[in-house]
């Protein structure tokens, strides 16, 4: 009984390592090589639109409402200690250090990541990738690489937008609704936030999350079983694995950045 359990555990561990190896080789083969900017630039621009611009609506709307909720809950707590003038500090630090990068990455995984997986999986199911290989076109360089760089570029920009509209949403609640003096709100935020460190750390988190989410999304699509059920399972795996990876990496990065 114990030997069977150990054998099963070892089999799963080897399978996981093999999957990581295939994912690493896919990304390496897609990115390493002679750059062809003139040929791939139109593909990159198109994917920036598909991955980034089409994700802006959910990012902006979610950012406004999360900022408003954060402003309202923060106001209710701070008024208990007669510290409601510190609401701007609370909203800005919460969004810059944690909520902005994490929530933007989770929304990006749900919207853009799942779309990338479904698109690549469908291309494999309809043998478009095999057709490219037959025509001496590297599908990794033509299909995977532009989508990867589009994700890496888009998510940090979407995170900045999320944080900006979130702070604006918090000011709507705190200043326009609850009547906090706007000077107190913005000055508390400016005094408490180290824009160089907090903004840089926010961007570092968003870049790490962008690489992770885009990599997982593309590999799950590339490795999907070429059936409708296989593509469906691959899309589900993308959202689940990306969400867990973002939350786990967030703890690691937070411990490294603010653990001292």
From Swiss-Prot:
Q: Which domain of life is it from?
A: Bacteria
Major place of residence: membrane
The UniProt gene name for this protein comes to mlaE
NCBIfam families reported in the protein's UniProt record = MlaE family lipid ABC transporter permease subunit (TIGR00056), perm_MlaE_1 (NF033619)
One GO biological-process annotation of the entry reads: intermembrane phospholipid transfer
* Cytoplasmic face of the membrane: 1-50, 110-147, 220-238
Spell out where the chain crosses the membrane: 51-71, 89-109, 148-168, 199-219, 239-259
A Pfam family that the UniProt record links to this protein: MlaE
Q: Which family does it belong to?
A: Belongs to the MlaE permease family.
Binding partners and assembly: The complex is composed of two ATP-binding proteins (MlaF), two transmembrane proteins (MlaE), two cytoplasmic solute-binding proteins (MlaB) and six periplasmic solute-binding proteins (MlaD).
Name one cellular component (GO) term.
phospholipid-translocating ATPase complex
Q: What is the protein named?
A: Intermembrane phospholipid transport system permease protein MlaE
Q: Which UniProt keywords apply?
A: Cell inner membrane, Cell membrane, Membrane, Transmembrane, Transmembrane helix, Transport
Q: Which residues lie on this side of the membrane: Periplasmic?
A: 72-88, 169-198, 260
């Amino acid at each position: 009984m114990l030997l069977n359990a150990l054998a099963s555990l070892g089999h799963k561990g080897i399978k996981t390592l093999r999957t990581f190896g295939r994912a690493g080789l896919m990304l390496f083969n897609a990115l390493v090589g002679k750059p062809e900017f003139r040929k791939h630039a139109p593909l990159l621009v198109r994917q920036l639109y598909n991955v980034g611009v089409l994700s802006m609506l959910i990012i902006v709307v979610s950012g406004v409402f999360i900022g408003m909720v954060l402003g309202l809950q923060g106001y209710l707590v701070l008024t208990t200690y007669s510290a409601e003038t510190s609401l701007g500090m609370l909203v800005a630090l919460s969004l810059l250090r944690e909520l902005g990068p994490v929530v933007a990455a989770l929304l990006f995984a749900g919207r853009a990541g799942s779309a990338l997986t479904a698109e690549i999986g469908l291309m494999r199911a309809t043998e478009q990738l095999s057709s490219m290989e037959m025509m001496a076109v590297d599908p990794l360089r033509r299909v995977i690489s532009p989508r990867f760089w589009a994700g890496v570029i888009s998510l940090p920009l979407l995170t900045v937008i999320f944080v900006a509209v979130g702070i604006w949403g918090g000011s709507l609640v705190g200043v326009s609704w609850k009547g906090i003096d706007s000077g107190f709100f913005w000055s508390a935020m400016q005094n408490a936030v180290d824009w160089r460190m907090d903004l840089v750390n926010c961007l570092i988190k968003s870049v790490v999350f962008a690489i992770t989410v885009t990599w997982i999304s593309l590999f799950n699509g590339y490795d999907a079983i070429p059936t409708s059920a296989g593509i469906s399972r691959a899309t589900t795996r993308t959202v689940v694995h990306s969400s867990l990876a973002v939350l786990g990496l967030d703890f690691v990065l937070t411990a490294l950045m603010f653990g001292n």
